[in-house]
Design a protein with these regions (language model features):
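Short helix-coil boundary/hinge micro-motifs
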Residues: 1-128, 132-135, 139
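Basic DNA-binding region of bZIP-type proteins
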Residues: 153-169
Length: 170
């Protein structure tokens, strides 16, 4: 599941957050200190961790849509992001960016990352693996942007083997 290079820029934060839950094993690494530290949630309360999990699953739903799944009718993503104040900053070189008012806020950092990725066209390339028992987030670097699995060696191979066996049965 982790054979790909990390997503570029702020998308790496989103990829890391989505991948804190391993659907196959059921392990939620938000229950561990290292994963919380990587996301800036070291001293997070139970409510903040619940919000992080809600954010994670809302982002996973969007990544699945990026991969070609039908849109989910409603996720709390808009509501979560609306609570993340951002400010426009202009660097000395004249470049502008949206930055979190509170850089310690995970939701604000995610909102800024989404805004930057949407502006540079990379947001739709953050996808979730098509395999139902995986849904691992990955950045699609394929030229056509039509990658379907987090790993051709694991999830892609399993899907192709299932398709082959199904075709042989008919």
């Amino acid at each position: 599941m982790a054979e790909r290079a990390p997503a570029p820029g702020g998308l790496a934060l989103i990829e890391t957050l989505v991948n804190t839950l391993d659907l196959e094993s059921g392990v939620d690494s938000l229950d561990t200190d290292p994963a919380r530290a990587a996301l800036g949630l070291v001293d997070a309360s139970a409510a903040e961790l619940a919000d992080a999990r809600e954010l994670r699953e809302s982002l996973r739903a969007v990544c699945l849509v990026h991969g070609g799944h039908p849109p989910v009718p409603a996720t709390p993503l808009d509501r979560l992001l609306a609570a993340a104040p951002l400010v426009v900053t202009v660097d000395p070189d004249g470049s502008a960016a949206l930055r979190p008012v509170d850089p310690g806020s995970l939701v604000a950092r995610v909102a800024a990352a989404i805004a930057a990725a949407a502006a540079d066209g990379t947001w739709p390339r953050l996808k979730a693996c098509e395999a139902a028992d995986c849904h691992w987030a990955y950045y699609d670097r394929s030229p056509a942007g039509r990658s379907r699995w987090c790993s051709m060696a694991v999830c892609g191979s399993r899907a192709k083997m299932r398709a082959y066996r199904a075709a042989r049965r008919t």
